[in-house]
Amino acid sequence: SSLPFVKEGVKNVLAKVPAERTVVALPFYTRLWKEVKGKKPHPEAYGMSGAESVVRANDASPKWDEATGQYYAEFKSSGATYKIWLEEETSLKKKLEVVKKSKTAGVAFWKLGFERAVTWTTIADAVRGW
């Protein structure tokens, strides 16, 4: 999810639920969007390592997208355009900063097993002193 989506979601929830009763859930996965002219876009879910493998296998070059707070890559294959906004440690750290500033009761993640081992170091560093 994009950084603005997380910020807006936290803001909307906290308008109705006290921070001390709120746990914010963040994703360990992303979606690869397949776009074919004249057809509805088709998304496919990938964990962090799987998404990185798809990008690498297609020689795509992820670029940091300041607007979304994520790396973005795009490539073409078999007449389709593929787009992916990557969930990885840099984007996760930015989202964790938003959650920490909101002083919620905590944070949760979905889906376990879709993260990389190094992801837990990023999380531990971010929640220290929460």
Name the predicted role of every residue range:
Residues 96, 110-112:
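C-terminal functional modules
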